[in-house]
């Protein structure tokens, strides 16, 4: 979203909440443009930049996918709150594992995963789709506090025998890792039913009766039924062993495969060929499946509801979340603002500001808010009168031909807001009788104009 213009347009109270606070907000944050861009970059339809070099990732076959691995590491490194394990498991094999530690139960682990290797050029459906969906879940959920740990895993060497996931699952079992569910995404972009129409939006969940895999399917279906998705589920039991979830079944972990419907014979006709390209992907279908998988991970992850939205008036930024601790940040310099640790903050200059909100063990960052009142015109002297000055009791403000709501903010000399009022008529009085003597600044703001007046209280 473009917060720059909205700062000017929304005036008295704007709430910025592009960051998610509820499961529905998480669903709404899944961005098809972002998914499409990742797909096109990761299948070499367009160039991308990896380690400052412009590159084309056309092929991701096992012996030829270092660049693809580097791309994934770079994408994940852009995110906060995760640690990356670049896991070399044999001479050419390399899993990319990103972990977001749970705030309450860090030992409870849920995995969302996909293989990123391929058998031919492009291979958009198999499995750039699953890879892009994992990256999108990471992009959204890494901004959130979650009770449980989420592992975003991208496997290598699936196509040569599930080698990457086998290595990881065996190691996890050996360590006694408490993995409670593994959501494996493999081929989730093709929906070709009813040629010439939009398809039937059926997708498969493949399960077998290993550990809690059937319960896990029920949980996914519960999420499917709790929110609105343009999807129709086909449960496949006994499900296929032919993807990475079966590495976890082999180690007695709960796991499912989710993807397009092989069960109804509606898989891509370009399977394992270089005809499997971006142009064959049903983007709305892929979008819906990514919303579902991201919503499921947010649900089992235990989304903690810290409101990291920020409200804004012409003078003040206020964190929506009450009863927390706060640190305001200057986004332009990426630095904390000394002393700015209240729920509200009054910037002294235009700029981009964010707030870090800590509630219990949970810290979330708001987005950067553009704070810019300098774009407003000043009131002309003929349009406004502020009198008497110096003032003892009532300060009168007269605005000629006023027809809109106007904000009055009175600050003391230290910049602290001491009085706030709005007027919709032409004349108003501010009672300053009970304020200490001294110098004050009155800020008067309409949607188009602003003025600041030095007032002396006697
Ligand atoms: Zn695959």
Feature annotation, model-predicted:
Residues 325-333, 341, 345, 349-352, ...:
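C-terminal outer-membrane/trafficking sorting elements
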Residues 352, 359-374:
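Short, compositionally biased serine/threonine- and acidic-rich segments at solvent-exposed termini, linkers
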Residues 37, 44-101:
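A non-catalytic alpha/beta surface segment that caps or lines the substrate-entry region
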Residues 1-23, 376, 416, 441, ...:
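Bacterial Sec-dependent N-terminal signal peptides
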Residues 193-305:
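Active-site-adjacent substrate-binding region
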Residues 312-321, 394-398:
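A short beta-strand segment in extracellular, disulfide-stabilized domains
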Residues 118-212:
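Acidic/histidine-rich catalytic neighborhood of metal-dependent amide-processing enzymes
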Residues 21-63, 117, 266-277:
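N-terminal capping segment at the start of a domain
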């Amino acid at each position: 979203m473009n917060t720059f213009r909205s700062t000017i347009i929304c005036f008295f109270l704007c709430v910025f909440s592009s960051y998610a606070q509820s499961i529905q907000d998480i669903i709404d944050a899944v961005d098809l443009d972002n998914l499409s861009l990742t797909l096109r970059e990761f299948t070499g339809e367009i160039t991308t930049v990896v380690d400052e070099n412009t590159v084309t990732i056309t092929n991701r076959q096992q012996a030829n996918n270092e660049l693809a691995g580097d791309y994934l590491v770079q994408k994940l490194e852009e995110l906060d709150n995760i640690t990356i394990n670049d896991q070399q498991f044999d001479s050419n094999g390399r899993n990319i594992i990103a972990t977001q530690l749970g705030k309450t139960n860090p030992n409870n682990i849920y995995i969302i995963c996909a293989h990123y290797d391929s058998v031919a050029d492009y291979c958009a459906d198999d499995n750039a789709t699953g890879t892009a969906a994992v990256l999108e879940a990471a992009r959204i959920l890494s901004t959130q506090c979650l009770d449980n740990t989420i592992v975003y895993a991208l496997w290598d060497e699936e196509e040569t025998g599930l080698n990457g996931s086998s290595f990881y699952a065996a190691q996890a079992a050996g360590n006694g890792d408490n993995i409670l569910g593994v959501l494996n995404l493999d081929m989730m972009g093709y929906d070709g039913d009813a040629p010439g129409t939009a398809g039937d939006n059926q997708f498969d969940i493949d399960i077998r009766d290993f550990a809690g895999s059937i319960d896990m399917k029920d949980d996914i279906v519960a999420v499917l039924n709790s929110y609105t998705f343009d999807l129709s589920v086909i449960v496949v039991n006994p499900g296929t062993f032919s993807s990475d979830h079966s590495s976890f079944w082999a180690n007695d972990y709960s796991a499912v495969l989710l993807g397009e419907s092989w069960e109804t014979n509606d898989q891509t006709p370009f399977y394992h060929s270089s005809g499997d390209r971006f142009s064959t992907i049903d983007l709305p279908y892929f979008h819906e499946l990514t919303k579902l998988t991201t919503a499921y991970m947010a649900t089992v992850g235990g989304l903690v509801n810290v409101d990291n939205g920020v409200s804004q008036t012409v003078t003040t930024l206020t964190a929506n979340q009450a009863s927390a601790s706060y640190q305001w940040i200057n986004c332009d310099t990426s630095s904390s603002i000394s002393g700015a640790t209240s729920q509200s903050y009054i910037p002294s200059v235009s700029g981009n500001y964010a707030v870090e909100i800590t509630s219990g063990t949970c810290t979330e960052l708001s987005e950067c808010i553009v704070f810019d009142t300098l774009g407003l015109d000043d009131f002309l002297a003929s349009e406004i009168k502020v009198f008497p000055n110096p003032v003892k009791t009532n300060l009168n403000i007269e605005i000629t031909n006023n027809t809109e709501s106007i904000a009055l903010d009175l600050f003391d000399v230290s910049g602290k807001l001491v009085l706030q009022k709005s007027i919709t008529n032409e004349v108003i009085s501010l009672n300053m009788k009970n304020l200490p003597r001294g110098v004050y600044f009155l800020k008067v703001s309409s949607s188009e104009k602003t003025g600041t007046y030095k007032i002396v209280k006697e």
